[in-house]
Amino acid sequence: MAKRSSLSIRIVEGKNLPAKDITGSSDPYCIVKVDNEPIIRTATVWKTLCPFWGEDYQVHLPPTFHTVAFYVMDEDALSRDDVIGKVCLTRDALASHPKGFSGWTHLVEVDPNEEVQGEIHLRLEVVPGVHASRLRCAVLEARDLAPKDRNGASDPFVRVHYNGRTQETSVVKKSCYPRWNETFDFELEKGASEALLVEAWDWDLVSRNDFLGKVAVNVQRLCSAQQEEGWFRLQPDQSKSRQGKGNLGSLQLEVRLRDETVLPSVCYQPLVQLLCQEVKLGTQGPGRLIPVIEETTSAECRQEVATTLLKLFLGQGLAKDFLDLLFQLELGRTSEANTLFRSNSLASKSMESFLKVAGMRYLHGILGPIIDRVFEEKKYVELDPSKVEVKDVGCSGLHRPQTEAEVLEQSAQTLRAHLVALLSAICRSVRTCPAIIRATFRQLFRRVRERFPNAQHQNVPFIAVTSFLCLRFFSPAILSPKLFHLRERHADARTSRTLLLLAKAVQNIGNMDTPVSRAKESWMEPLQPTVRQGVAQLKDFIMKLVDIEEKEELDLQRALNSQAPPVKEGPLFIHRTKGKGPLASSSFKKLYFSLTTEALSFAKTSSSKKSTFIKLASIRAAEKVEEKSFGSSHIMQVIYADDVGRAQTVYLQCKCVNELNQWLSALRKASTNNRGLLRSYHPGIFRGDKWSCCHQKDKTDQGCDKTHSRVTLQEWNDPLDHDLEAQLIYRHLLGVEAALRERYQLLRGATEAGVSPTGCDGAPEDSLAQLLRVLQDLREAHGSSLASPAAREPHHLLELQT
């Protein structure tokens, strides 16, 4: 049994932000922090007070996280970025919105007294005495304190207040992981109701000390327990009233927290086997669970259910059969060929998810070079005469501005060149298209041709394929390359217009250049010769694409499996330390890294024949490094065991917080099942004769901070998690259980009356009855897990805090 938490985050837009630049504008971006740890940075939107981001993220976290905060920043090229304001959502607030938090929220000022993080290790006890008892507080150590000084560290000390007395620890210089091991005694009066207050501070020689956090302990509860020891989370100081600083603007967010208790695999086997049996039966037998699931799934959660089902069947090797069943169901209720797969049905949503899960690398290979060219050229492109702005295009010759006709002709030439290059890339891609996608399109093509065999519908099988390949895959990726991981930043206005016109042309080709699509925007006429040629090319491509037999499919799949693509790759800066000499950022060397399911390798270039490998099975942790260690906040460490079992560390520098977290996520997910994973680590480096983080002199000393192996970002190429997918399906079915029971009663009544439901030759209620029994068994299994001693164990440390 494992408890898992995930956050679905959509950062939509901001409005009415204050101007931070002398031009009266700002260059805003967002930083997302979980428990004050940066995990996401959005793109910067330049010169605006009402930025639109539209960025989506899925973050997997341990269930013990407390807050997620959104900081709106103003990017500055020459000085430190300005903080505009923040929105903070607690875990409890998110849990109170099961369907997710959505809407506009006012930004508030960032108060230093609320910017706290970390934990403090205390041992508290009541010591009996002859005349009076004493309250003893041992301040042992702290970890992950907020860095308050410019050097990326703090100089922490602790104040302990009780019963009118204040005592202090010594100051530990330049450490966010201090160890004090100091004990303080206070007289304990009978019936005392005052709390014991433990405050952490950053000592400053010149300016005021900075607040690092506090813990307030309920002494009455401590008297009952007599003694407690553990790590207490530092809390912000909210005793001072917040001073308003005018309107800081608003942020539109969509955030959903999902907590799941994932049971052992054996618990989900009956559910998975039942669903797989239904897919194998198809539309021939009495199994009708998939249609019932579709009917009871609301539009708002259809995409999520489709993705989960698709991943579940992909893991069982039945994705093609599942999609084929959905194709047949959709065709069975479609009478008009021109409406086929145009709705947001389960079939359409499942096919969308399938292409993203199985075909993203294929998409990148086709679109990547063309999208890069459009971004790099930054040409002004416009075909609509009503939108042409001659001033935007400069001059074609000396002292003579371009005419509108010249602008339109030049734009048409640019778009034709991009379209020809794109069609050429598509037509050459038959052999690089994943075999499972080709086989699925083959089934779709055949099913549609069987359903609409007349000559007047000869284009319908092609349009069925292009409705997914072009309209729901290529065109959206061209329109929004960042959402498909083709670019790190959104396009500017000029590039966006070029991409929009190119996407429209691809849609026209995907629609097989129908008169309706031509009539909508007559100004697209200059592209018509290329579009007509593209239709012929695309038809030829589709015929080759679907011309795949089962043996060829298996051979291609085996070849693909034997040449597993990298999980992640790209250039990074490396520093390998043997504990000799000083460590500095200048000692980093740029190399090309590649992470596969077998190893992390690095070489001078991506094409180098000689590489160095770190076996994936030998990785023990992948963690961030303190900013003060190298003067950069974008450095991670990979701790691994060498051939003789000794711990070694390699330090890698990334270019930004997003790249850092993407590499950390990839490494953590790839090594999640490794033996010997570390539970603690040193976020600093061993410089000279001690660790820079906690100042301990033993190089083999246990780490001073917890590892974060469960903090990961969801990516399109994540490995399938069969148990989690089964749990998500169970959770959805549990939510529609009442509708399933109602459907079961109707089917049972019809069978008893001797009326067989349309399309069912057997007893469809048997499948539903099995499903309802499986749901009941899983409900009982979850109930047993919640009733276990570990689940019921009280959180003493939380109860002690006031």
Swiss-Prot record:
GO molecular function list: GTPase activator activity; phospholipid binding; zinc ion binding
Residues annotated as domain Ras-GAP: 317-545
Entry binding sites for Ca(2+) 6: D204, S207, D210
A Pfam family the protein falls into: PH
Entry note: cofactor: Binds 3 Ca(2+) ions per C2 domain.
Residues engaged in binding Zn(2+): H682, C693, C694, C704
Keywords: Calcium, Cell membrane, Cytoplasm, GTPase activation, Membrane, Metal-binding, Repeat, Zinc, Zinc-finger
Binding site for Ca(2+) 1: D21, D27, D74, D76
Topological relation to the membrane, as annotated: Peripheral membrane protein
Gene3D superfamilies recorded: C2 domain (2.60.40.150), GTPase Activation - p120gap, domain 1 (1.10.506.10), Pleckstrin-homology domain (PH domain)/Phosphotyrosine-binding domain (PTB) (2.30.29.30)
PH domain residues: 565-672
Gene Ontology terms: cellular component: cytosol; plasma membrane
Cofactor requirement: Ca(2+)
Binding site for Ca(2+) 5: D149, D202, D204, D210
Protein name per its UniProtKB record: Ras GTPase-activating protein 4
Gene source species: Mus musculus
Taxonomic lineage: Eukaryota, Metazoa, Chordata, Craniata, Vertebrata
Gene from which this protein is expressed: Rasa4
